[in-house]
């Protein structure tokens, strides 16, 4: 079995983590698995972060082949030859943006032409990109034409798939838990490890900072005067993938600096469990979204979540039980933060998260993923 997508040594955040965790799960079920990752994923002018390479050790027990060049058609043919020679039963193609459509589509096309019998499954994070551009739909259609079936991680993305006219087998799967960052630790230990005062309540923004993820909404909400009487701080943990200027302007104009913990850099895997164990509420105030792996980290650590009612985010959180679902509006977001603090909702919501998380197993995910591409 071959998985094509970001993995170590790329520093690709949640997508690399997902692919590696999926490979482990497939191995646990007796499959021989190899991940083909990129030797070059993005040209420098397109990559907004500081570096594309991880300084963390390779994940143990995984076969990862650094082979695919996103912009080199000759390399696509070489990689397709490798796929054919590997004789995989399944070729899982991770798709998240139209920029990757020529590379992944031609790899799939050539591997079949060269004689590969692998069932080609598109595992699509997005069909309509967060930042659309001319030809994006054409490119996505081209990629999808080179697949035998498709799986999505939210109803909204599957609806986009259908809207593009995809008529091959498709399935909506539940995004499994990110349970590979280590076990939860007690809150005081987590705070002490991070150098935080455990006397405060902490809310958490986690992940790359991009316009669609709505950190601006969150900062505006956190400036609500009602929150100043509460002993609460917001942790912003993630690397800027755009200019920080507008966020810094909000922080300055709203005098938010004393109420923030800014960890605006790439977050290492060994830091994740401490951040989610220290936080009592994960805040995902997106302007628009498909789904987010951050939610699945929150589930693993039994941390309640506040999400905006956009895309697939609301599909996972039961409003007023495991968290809150609200409009992408600073005042409404602040209303729910106040409710969480004033009514001491953490314990009851955390208990509901612990129950809900049972729905998101990796074993069930990979079983359904493979069956989606099998002949009926």
Residue map of PLM features:
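N-terminal strand-loop element at the rim of the active site
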Residues: 5-12, 24-86, 162, 170, ...
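Donor nucleotide-sugar binding/catalytic pocket of nucleotide-sugar-dependent glycosyltransferases
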Residues: 145-185
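A short helix/loop element that forms part of the nucleotide-sugar donor recognition site in Leloir-type
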Residues: 182-196
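Conserved donor-binding/catalytic core segment of Leloir-type glycosyltransferases
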Residues: 196-213, 219-222, 235
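Nucleotide-activated donor-binding/catalytic signature segment of Leloir-type glycosyltransferases, i.e.
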Residues: 245-270
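Acidic donor-binding loop of glycosyltransferase active sites
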Residues: 274-290, 303
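Conserved acidic donor-binding segment of nucleotide-sugar-dependent glycosyltransferases
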Residues: 319-331, 338-344
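A short, well-ordered alpha-helix in the C-terminal region of glycosyltransferases
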Residues: 345-359
